């Protein structure tokens, strides 16, 4: 099986900025044989799949809540284009449950309007499996260096799309 045999997974990504202009990042749980296994760069923003027939903005709000418990947000911006990444060749057939060559993502930026007490990652709300074991607010420019290397270029595009939101 080669990457060309597989589709991209349609996904959303969510950048949440606090009032100080810092971005919410979660430290991924690296469980078993996944695309995160063995990488020290495990900090990422919330993201997830778009369900069949689901509006991407609705998917972004759903994924944000399922992964973090965050609901108190206001929409700031949408990235102008879809952003994608490819899995490295050694993860084809393994990462993303073996079904995809990478992800094609629609990114949204939100302002966090709530209190940090609403953030719940372990366990997250609704009986969902935890995806993160820690979280923190990070400067936007640090995000590409905090993610697994094969997602770095995508994160550079996300930062470029939303850098105007930081004061």
From Swiss-Prot:
Taken from the record, one Pfam family name reads: NUDIX
Output one GO MF annotation.
bis(5'-adenosyl)-pentaphosphatase activity
Which stretches make up the Nudix hydrolase domain? 7-160
Database matches in CDD domains: NUDIX_Ap4A_hydrolase_plant_like
Q: Which GO terms describe its biological process?
A: nucleoside phosphate metabolic process; ribose phosphate metabolic process
Q: Which cofactor does it need?
A: a divalent metal cation
- SUPFAM superfamilies recorded: Nudix (SSF55811)
E.C. designation(s): 3.6.1.-
Motif Nudix box, chain ranges: 48-69
Alphabetically list the UniProt keywords. Answer: Hydrolase
What is the main EC category here?
A: hydrolase
> What does the protein in this record do?
Accelerates the degradation of transcripts by removing pyrophosphate from the 5'-end of triphosphorylated RNA, leading to a more labile monophosphorylated state that can stimulate subsequent ribonuclease cleavage.
> HAMAP family in the record, alphabetically?
Nudix_RppH (MF_00298)
Family listed: Belongs to the Nudix hydrolase family. RppH subfamily.
Q: NCBIfam families under this entry?
A: PRK00714.1-5
Q: Protein name, please?
A: RNA pyrophosphohydrolase
Q: In which organism is this protein found?
A: Rhizobium meliloti (strain 1021) (Ensifer meliloti)
Q: Organism classification, top ranks? A: Bacteria, Pseudomonadati, Pseudomonadota, Alphaproteobacteria, Hyphomicrobiales
């Amino acid at each position: 099986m080669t990457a060309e045999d597989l589709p991209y997974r349609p996904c959303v990504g969510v950048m949440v900025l606090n009032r100080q202009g810092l971005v919410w990042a979660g430290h991924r749980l690296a469980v078993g044989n996944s695309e995160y296994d063995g990488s020290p760069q495990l900090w990422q923003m919330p993201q997830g799949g778009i369900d069949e027939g689901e509006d991407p903005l609705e998917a972004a709000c759903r994924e944000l809540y399922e992964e973090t418990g965050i609901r108190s947000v206001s929409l700031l911006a949408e990235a102008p284009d879809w952003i994608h990444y490819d899995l490295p060749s050694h993860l084809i057939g393994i990462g993303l449950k073996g079904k995809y060559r990478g992800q094609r993502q629609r990114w949204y930026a939100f302002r966090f309007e709530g209190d940090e007490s609403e953030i719940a990652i372990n366990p997250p709300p609704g009986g969902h499996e935890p995806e993160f074991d820690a979280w923190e607010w990070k400067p936007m420019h640090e995000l590409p260096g905090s993610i697994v290397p094969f997602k770095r270029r995508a994160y550079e595009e996300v930062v470029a799309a939303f850098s105007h939101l930081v004061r």
